[in-house]
From Swiss-Prot:
Enzymatic class: hydrolase
Expression triggers: By beta-1,3-xylan.
Activity regulation information from UniProt: Completely inhibited by Cu(2+), Hg(2+) and N-bromosuccinimide. Strongly inhibited by Ag(+), Zn(2+) and Pb(2+). Moderately inhibited by Fe(3+), Al(3+), Mn(2+), dithiothreitol and p-chloromercuribenzoic acid. Slightly activated by Mg(2+) and Ca(2+). Unaffected by Na(+), K(+), Ba(2+), EDTA, iodoacetic acid and N-ethylmalaimide.
Active site: E138, E234
Gly residues composition-biased segments: 348-366
Region of interest (Carbohydrate binding module (CBM)), ranges: 368-460
EC number: 3.2.1.32
Region (Disordered): 347-371
Domain GH26 stretches: 23-337
Molecular function, one GO term: xylan 1,3-beta-xylosidase activity
Activity as a function of temperature: Optimum temperature is 37 degrees Celsius. Stable below 30 degrees Celsius.
Protein name, entry field: Beta-1,3-xylanase TXYA
Reactions that this protein is recorded to catalyse: Random hydrolysis of (1->3)-beta-D-glycosidic linkages in (1->3)-beta-D-xylans
Length: 460
């Protein structure tokens, strides 16, 4: 306790010397720290239910080779990924997305998966919210099999495509390092793709005490030296079993577990975690806490072939849950609210179209429903650059549904008796629309195609 008190005292004095200044990044809050939760769909849902709150940010993953986990369920033993489902479940939360290279960073850099990159960017860009894209997350983690040159080339390509496709306002690029204690110091520069293409520096925070916080401090200093905001993209009290109140010093197999009190666990891991934020308050602008029962997910479970992780769910121990809630009640932590997106520097993209569309379409249509609006599968004009595709519900089981424009598909939302989804489009252009829906009482699924010319019709 004396050592911790000394560390807090010195760090607090040092923090007072920091001067507020503008950081070079995108979707960076002027004040405060974004609080997000991960990292699989069901763990996020469990946290939200147990804590009685909507997370300000939610985290999930996708593989670039097959886009597994983007719009369909994917579980590689670390919990279920489905970014579209998660985004629809939390429509007013920021989205933090980790993209795996699936061990093929060279082919990614060579352009083999450029079409998948574009699909990913368009899907994320269509969500009306701040998106933090952790491209090739934990870039220097040896388990990922990355090489420096291909990694940097792919990072620069994605940054450029975000701008070319028109989504620079809501997709921010995060360069995340592993902060892994066994890695040698002084290597970050070899992985750096350039100040001009990095919006945030990210790090992982699991067991930094194993190397006296050297690796996380190195990452923080790298962000500071490049004037970039810092995001703790992955954090969890590794080797602690919160439900069982135990800790193991064995990172490989979790042997010789020691009994801990709830107060000990809080003081040993959580207090230094939040103190790290104090120490770096000049640059630290976001964190993601992985709130999961790692031991119940087969990738992390016994015999612990990928190391021993434990159980990090804060809700399972009343004392830890209370301390967590008390800590996050500090106004410096950005929680979910109606002002969340504005706090993150993201504007309301709906502001300019509503009145104009109403006037233009009312005049053109003469106040009457256009003749071609009688079709159940149709579209509405939103703006000269946005089309809403919809299909009237015909009583399908509809456990899933997708609306597509030129074979670019997104999960639809059901409202007022119809499934709908908006897409970027150009007025006057011809498009192929497709609707796919589960139909367990019929043929298993229905697939309906239609070719249309995008006009300023408004059908509903």
């Amino acid at each position: 306790m004396k050592k911790l008190a000394k560390m807090i005292s010195v760090a607090t004095l040092g923090a007072c010397a920091f001067q507020a200044h503008a950081l070079d990044g995108k979707l960076v809050p002027d004040q405060g720290i974004l609080v997000s939760v991960g990292q699989d769909v069901d763990s996020v849902n469990d946290y939200s239910s147990a804590m009685g709150t909507t997370p300000a940010g939610v985290t999930n993953y996708v593989g670039i080779v097959n886009l597994d986990g983007l719009s369909t369920d994917a579980d590689a033993g670390a919990g279920r990924n489905n970014i579209v489902e998660l985004a629809n479940q939390y429509p007013t939360s920021a989205l933090i997305v980790g993209v795996s290279m699936n061990g093929e960073v060279q082919n990614v850099a060579n352009g083999q998966y450029n079409a998948n990159i574009d699909t990913l960017i368009r899907t994320l860009g269509e969500f009306d919210r701040p998106v933090y894209l952790r491209w090739a997350y934990e870039v220097d983690g040896p388990w990922n099999g990355h090489n420096t040159e291909d990694l940097k080339q792919s990072f620069r390509h994605v940054y450029q495509r975000i701008r070319e496709l028109g989504y620079a306002d809501n997709i921010s690029m995060v360069w995340q390092v592993a902060s892994y204690c066994p890695t040698a110091p002084g290597q970050l520069g070899t992985w750096w793709p350039g100040d001009d293409v990095v919006d945030w520096v990210g790090l992982s925070y699991f067991a930094p005490q194993d190397c006296n916080w050297d690796r996380v401090n190195e990452a923080a200093q790298w962000a500071r030296s490049h004037n970039k905001p810092l995001f703790i993209n992955e954090s969890s009290p590794q080797r602690y079993q919160l439900a069982d109140l135990t800790y193991s010093t064995d990172p490989a197999k979790g042997t010789n577990r020691q009994a801990k009190t709830d107060q000990q666990i809080w003081s040993e891991w959580f207090e230094p975690f939040f103190q790290f934020m104090v120490d770096n308050q000049d640059i630290l602008k976001g964190f993601t806490y992985i709130n999961a029962d790692w031991d119940s997910q087969w990738r992390w479970a016994a015999p612990y072939n990928e190391g021993y992780w434990g159980d990090s769910r804060v809700q399972v121990i009343p004392y830890i849950k209370q301390k967590w809630q008390e800590t996050l009640s500090d106004p410096k932590f950005i929680r979910h609210s109606d002002e969340l997106f504005a706090q993150l520097g993201y504007g309301n993209s709906d502001g300019g179209n509503g009145g104009d569309n109403g006037g233009d379409n009312g005049g053109d249509n003469g106040g009457e429903t256009p003749e071609n609006c009688t079709d159940d599968f149709n579209f509405n004009y939103v703006s000269d650059n946005e089309i809403e595709v919809y299909h009237v519900d015909k009583g399908w089981s509809a456990g899933w549904n997708y609306l597509c424009l030129d074979d670019y598909c997104l999960s639809g939302t059901k409202s007022n008796g119809a499934f709908s989804r908006s897409f970027s489009a150009q007025l006057g252009q011809t498009y192929k629309m497709t609707f796919k829906v589960e139909d367990i009482t019929g043929q298993g699924q229905q697939i309906i195609d239609k070719t249309v010319t995008f006009t300023n019709q408004v059908c509903n």
